[in-house]
């Protein structure tokens, strides 16, 4: 979308479940969390930080050298900002309580988890077209599997992340506006949007009245920012390229001002929680 264009969508409704597994390590893997007292303080600081910033701590596990968390975030939250607040508050409170110079190492690991694992989510997206009863050769251009996609899609110097999201968008008033002609061109455009806004497309299923996507993102960008980038850019693109379709259907907004976003990963949230319980 050109820089001088006013965004069509600014505030959106959302249904979401965004779960993240975070793993921090102590400075030089020194046993700085060996005592029950230090582990208790760490848990209190993490709980307080989560409460103050509208995060939900679902599970936690500590040993002498590592902190492992399963947290739930809102679409407006970015992983990198949540990590910055959690680590910053831990450092501050431990410095106050124990006169410690440094508690945590520089990096972190972050991985998404969800109701279902990534493979099941991919299959779910791939089966949407037949699920809704669409059949025949004309439906093949409505499904896109990115042969160039590799995960991890992004690499960073001091931390490692694999952040996979399942996104669903419905057209304005569920009006059918997409077809096999628009589909392939729309997929190419969404890939271009991803390159600009730091997400990689894994796969897309496009139905006449809604779209499913699986993408991999970066920790510095929130789900809400990804969604706004996709919705605003594709709305502008449809207006520019297919104004005849929008005029005929009356769907000038293209999308409803709402969406679904769910995290998916190698393991489900329940599997991660079960792992914590066994520690």
Predicted regions and their residues:
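Charge-rich, low-complexity N-terminal segments
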Residues: 2-279
